[in-house]
Amino acid sequence: MAARLRKALDQYGVEATSAVSTGPKPEVYDFYQGPLTIGLVPRQYRQARIARMQAVADFARNAGIPAVQGHCGFIPENPSDELYRETVAAIRTVAEYCRKNRRSFRCETGQETPITLVRAIRDVGLDNVGVNFDVANLIMYGKANPLDAVDVLAPYIQGVHAKDGLYPTDPRNLGAEVPIGEGKVNFPALIEKLRRIGYHNPLTIEREISGEKQRADVLKAKAYLEKLIG
């Protein structure tokens, strides 16, 4: 499958910037079950998630994709929390495997505050660990304003998900994802700030719905972002 993907990417001139690792399930994206089911934090799913990420690293190597990315989970804010130390060790295991495959590992923003993610990356202590900066997730999880988060995460931003969303108002559920330009992300200011920190990698449009509306929203977002980028 990796060889077929590589052939198709080359044939159609598509750049695959990362291979995304998800699952194994369950993964519940809310504020109650999320901490218990997402990423490398939950003990009962951790080994299976590590194995999945390692398998994705093998796939990325075989397909010529430079990075693996995924959610690490609701990383505890307290660095003395045993779950924090265990999660850092799990990230290190994944990142070491990626490094053997000459791939980077990107932690997707969302469930943790930016400074907690920086702390975890530094405690992992490997130079192939970075961030996939999902600007809407920071808002939808209520963790940060993405403009401010750039200041914290700048040295580690390797990829960017262009997505838009709203802050949560229901304490159980995430804020809503909305089409780019209809949410709280200030894309003109964000793109300018990314330029200032020297970010020149792709902006990957993400619209997590399906069907014709997804296609229409992605095309509209592409046109909007191209005008901003110039």
Locations of regions flagged by a protein language model:
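Histidine-acidic metal/acid-base catalytic patches
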Residues: 3, 10, 92, 100, ...
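Hydrophobic residues within beta-strands of alpha/beta enzymes
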Residues: 17-19, 68, 160, 202-203
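Generic serine detector
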Residues: 18-21, 80, 104, 210
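Active-site loop/turn elements of alpha/beta-hydrolase fold enzymes
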Residues: 21, 72-73, 110, 162-165
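Metal-dependent catalytic neighborhoods of phosphoester/phosphodiester hydrolases
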Residues: 1-3, 80
